[in-house]
Amino acid sequence: MTNKFLFFFLLAAVTFAACNKSDRKMTNDQLQMTNNLIVRIAEIEVNEGYLEAYLAAAHNVGTKSVESEPGVICIFPMQVKDAPNTIRIVEIYRNDEAYQAHLQTPHFLEYKQGTLHMVKSLQLVATEPLAPEAMPLIFKKY
């Protein structure tokens, strides 16, 4: 009886895993879009005395960009816990055209001009996704 139960349990588990895996396969369109993604991390050091104003501006531009720009998949600002004036922003754009369009939007230009004096340093780090098949699962907008 125990062997029979174990057999059916394993059969059910394998079937569930196979069904679940097939739902996660990327379509050709999704795979093509993933190949065109612009994924970067902005590393920002904020000048002393400007942290609150910078955080508000970063939150504002991130929210407006994701809400209003179809090619902006993610703009996710984060603050480093042990270094509050150190900000990291994960940026994901559908393609280079979406990124270039983002740079021309009124909300980005306002953010850029309004925070120039607040930023001590800025470095943009280009990256490659290691698990592109996870993108549709993580980002519903994708």
Give residue spans per PLM region.
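C-terminal motif of bacterial Sec signal peptides marking the signal peptidase cleavage site
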Residues: 15-18
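Positively charged n-region of N-terminal signal peptides that target proteins for export
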Residues: 1-5, 21
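Non-catalytic surface loops within mature trypsin-like serine protease
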Residues: 46-48, 95, 128-130
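An amphipathic, aromatic/His-enriched active-site/gating alpha helix that lines ligand/cofactor pockets
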Residues: 64-74, 92-127
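Sec-dependent N-terminal signal peptides
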Residues: 5-13
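Short amphipathic alpha-helical segments
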Residues: 50-72
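Glycine-rich beta-strand-turn "strand-cap" elements at beta-sheet edges
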Residues: 20-38, 76-83, 112-142
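Short, well-ordered beta-strand segments in beta-rich or mixed alpha/beta enzyme
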Residues: 37-45, 74-103, 141
